[in-house]
């Protein structure tokens, strides 16, 4: 009765107005699952490939009709009739049918939509929430959010080189309280920026995108906003950065054009070390470029005992790249983006590999999102303790926070908010 009976795909829009793939999987029992895939702006060179049509007459070449046709054609032919609960077998079949090392033939967007929709259908067939279906009875940790309240880099049209400035409400007792704390600080930040004459338009991930001159200025505004909202930076709330350093790494140089600074790897490490000394920064993502393994080792040796160093473009949710990084002693955490690797099984393997090595895992959205809230369930299912899903505005971001609040209510007294347990040192 849990056999896959039908798969329907369609082209929908993401939060940037670009096409993406949505899939409905229906089982013989009548149970259904639906999933829509996200898309990134700053993408790692080693990510699985999302398939775009390239037809300039539609969506500027960004259409996904080829991916849709693969879902309803080759993919359905390959997995139709299979038991939806056999997730690993289904994902292995998808990988085999694609036949490429980076999922470039069928497209990671087509494969992931099917993989996630299948898991949701199986959960619905069993009558349990997705987080419980995937994580079992031990899925009970509500993650600390990394809330991106100031956007820069590729996520905004402003001079700030660093892509994301985030807050983490580590002292909140529950996820619902954490969301409230974040929303109050976000509102206070809007007032502070406006009073200083800055615009309060928001970027791709819902954070403000003011024309600030430096990372230090952005962090100073966030510090003031926390205090105005009644919270203590470093005690109630900690800070996190996503540098997306690959985006400003040119010809062996880290070129912070907005600040007028250029560094080699050692200089970039000193720059980040200085910021972490001035502000309560407890997590830095992609502080160095995706293939600068030597620089990453220096960063890890310098800051790794007290700061969480997250590999996003460095690891691209790929268990093999993660294992390589672990062997070299680089970074101490992985950012988990389901569309970077293209199947649910490989995503879960990446989290498991990280945890076995003592690395933290942070479940993450992409800058081009939809109303799909699957990553909220995945964060709880894996007990990863942290989630990165944007600011406190734009419904594509708040959908994930709202789902976490629902999960917390569902867990009742068995749920626990990760809080300060995520901190190093």
UniProtKB/Swiss-Prot annotation:
Q: Binding of (2R)-2-phosphoglycerate: at which residues?
A: 163, 337, 366-367, 388
Give EC number(s), comma-separated: 4.2.1.11
Tell me its family: Belongs to the enolase family.
According to UniProt, the reaction catalysed is:
(2R)-2-phosphoglycerate = phosphoenolpyruvate + H2O
**Record's protein name:** Enolase
One MF annotation (Gene Ontology) recorded for this entry: phosphopyruvate hydratase activity
Record's cofactor remark: Binds a second Mg(2+) ion via substrate during catalysis.
Kindly list the places in or outside the cell where this protein is found, as annotated in its UniProt entry: Cytoplasm; Secreted; Cell surface
Which PANTHER family does the entry link to? ENOLASE
Query: Binding positions for Mg(2+)?
Result: 242, 285, 312
Statement: the UniProt record of this protein carries the keyword Acyltransferase: no
Q: Name one GO cellular component term.
A: cell surface
Q: Which organism is it from?
A: Granulibacter bethesdensis (strain ATCC BAA-1260 / CGDNIH1)
- Active site at 205, 337
